[in-house]
């Protein structure tokens, strides 16, 4: 798991995404506390325990089959809200095209 220090700075909720660059984009550019994994298939069972106390976990799912499968598998383990992106898009491409406010609004997070 990447960027675990954001677990400490997060309040009642946290974001999870796939890829280090997307994680940093959410955390540093968009202002959403976030942890990430290197790829959709790299989630370890013990990561769930690190996030179990959050009221809500926002999964920022890449716009591809592995990204959607990753989000749906976490939804079976945690209280998640899945924030999906169109085919071929992810956090970083959306940030580059539309900006931070677009991502915050997509997630319904306005108090960052």
Please place each PLM-identified region on the residue numbering.
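TOPRIM fold recognition
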Residues: 8-14, 21-112
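Charged, flexible boundary elements
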Residues: 1-5
